[in-house]
Amino acid sequence: MSEFSERIVKQTEALLHFQHDETLQETTPERLHEALGQVIMMEISDNWTKTKRRQAPGRRAFYFSAEYLVGRLVYSNLFNLGILREMKAAFAEKGVDLACLEHIEDAALGNGGLGRLAACFLDSAATLDLSLTGYGLRYRFGLFKQSFVGGCQREDADDWTKYGDPWSHRRDKLAVKVKFADQTVNCVPYDMPVIGYETTTVGTLRLWQCEAEEELNFDAFNAQDYVKALEKKNKAEDITRVLYPNDSTWEGKRLRVKQQYVLSSASLQDILRDYRQEHGTDYYRLPEFIAVQLNDTHPAMSIPELIRLLMAEGLDFDAAFELTRRVFSYTNHTVMTEALEKWDLELLRSVVPEVCEIIERIDAKLKQEHPHTTLFIVKDGQAHMANLSVYMSTAVNGVAEIHSQILKDDLFKDWYAIYPERFQNKTNGITPRRWLGLSNPELCGLLDSKVGAGYLKHLDQLEGLKAGIDEMTVKQFNAIKLEKKRQLCRVIEEHEGVALDPSFIFDVQVKRLHEYKRQLLNALSIMDLYLSIKDGSIKDFTPTAFIFGAKAAPGYRRAKAIIHYVNRVADLINSDPAMDGVMKVVFVQNYNCSYAEHIIPAADISEQISPAGTEASGTGNMKLMLNGAVTLGTLDGANVEIAEQAGSENEYIFGATVEEINMVKPNYNARSFYKANPNLRRAVDTLIDGTVPTDEEQHELYTSLLEGASWHKPDQYFLFYDFDSYKKARLRVNHDYCDRIAFGRKCLMNVASAGKFSSDRTICQYAEDIWHIKPVK
């Protein structure tokens, strides 16, 4: 045991004794986690303070995001400090297995790829010694904790801080006030350290928690009006109670607007306070020192809010306007027009009247600047937040090459015609530290022997693996993959009660549940395979486990119906004795970052099946590629670049291209595909014909495919159009898997080609091309 690890263990023991009168051997995993976290926070505090002091005088970038999917921090922090293995051994000497911390809750601060991207970016910035600070919200209960009851999604509050939150520092003295039309709230920052890998830099993620100015109305309490006594407290805390509150009602929309305004106003007040401390009150120099990146449009209210704050400091509107448009840059994350955020002016006026007025003034300025164009920010009584972000930013970027091209050619083509210099591409990336080093140490052992150390900071070094993919290397890789499958089987049996066979192909689709991500296509295809195996039309089939993981938004009926249908398909197949040794289906509950760390290294097939032109990029595809899964996917998002890097012969690409979809879309007749394809028809009919139990929501899915639903046209996302192509690709990968050496070589080519998809590369490009910041050591 080294002196350092011995000190950590002793301090942890001392804290447990002081706080709980317990020994290491007597304590619970939760209390061990809290004590160890506090000790590590003390150990890094000096580097954290030094980092802040080094970065404060210079130019800095700030990342505004509604989500940060940071996952479980204890292992990743120990890993980035370079002491994970050492600490496991040190605690083992005391009879304590740090694997007990596997049961610690993930921090419930995000949901999908948007939040995980933000977390990866902060990790990369700290590792590269870049002055990037994250700002977000500290949600008391996150999105929700998912479970299945009778196959249906159930949502429960995710009480992730129930046993403490040792990785945050509450900073009361830095609290700020945020005013709405009907209330004023205290916003208290909680700082999370972002520990760089193999560096002394410790970045900061600052999260705001809303609290009441007055915790208790004592007069109301004495008058025994207990509801009124706590009314202000509850109303304030509601703002940061959950991520993405249901906004199907007026009050729900007001709460969403309040969330977004708190993120914007509190963060900007904090930034301006630091600016004044370092540079005084000469706000005309603000763009020299400050760059703010908007991660999608949730923080877009920052634009009018900065104008408002500068005007409150004495600047006139025109001066504040010109300064503001030199501070912000905007990352777009969707190509679907219906997903672009817009707010009714009446709604904004009822919550943030001053901000609403400034948005209208910005719109007037735009129309004055470009009187002969169709550009707008306000239209039909609505503020279009993406348009506001494009107009007021120095740079606008997509997150994959195909996505960025669609922004220029379609979504923002009128803006691109006037501001072509603003539009850039920054293909997303993932941190190799968490998604390879931490989650797959077995594969790292093989890579160390082939390309040497260093690839976790310079992922393009994996390219050197290509020359050495011989039969022995493939066999070593296959053995590692089998071990990761065995590990996942144990996790799934513990959490889901489903026993999987690790010798099966592991076919994985894990991502947010949305119709455009086409989990329903996957499920219908599985049903088709099942029925075809049963009737003998498919005779040779390599045994496969189909693994799903996804949460559906609480108010998204059809997404929840898809989950229920997948679970019904799973019940049918898993209870059929004829499918023993042939096929299994499992939908894991409460899929999150920590579950992903088990699933992704075990996957053989990465399902990336959204219709071309709908997924901005995706990052799950990159994580799966890095861990040696082949992509079964469309030419959408980053799939295009994955196939370019690894070679299309090492992926399984299917489906219509963007150009083909645009060509067929105007006259697309879903019913004609349904009628012409008996296998498709048989699979789709299982939604309603009693093959599996059905209900009103499942009938709605069926109707949405054949007749349309709400604003959707029939088969809005072209499941029928791509059905046969998907089936052929799926059967091809199923057949190819039998040649374990040839298939293993494809997998290793994916690992060796993943260098481009490091978030280190992405962050370097943001730093150089958009934020104009350099490393500060």
Residue ranges and their predicted role:
Residues 1-777:
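A conserved ligand/cofactor-binding region detector
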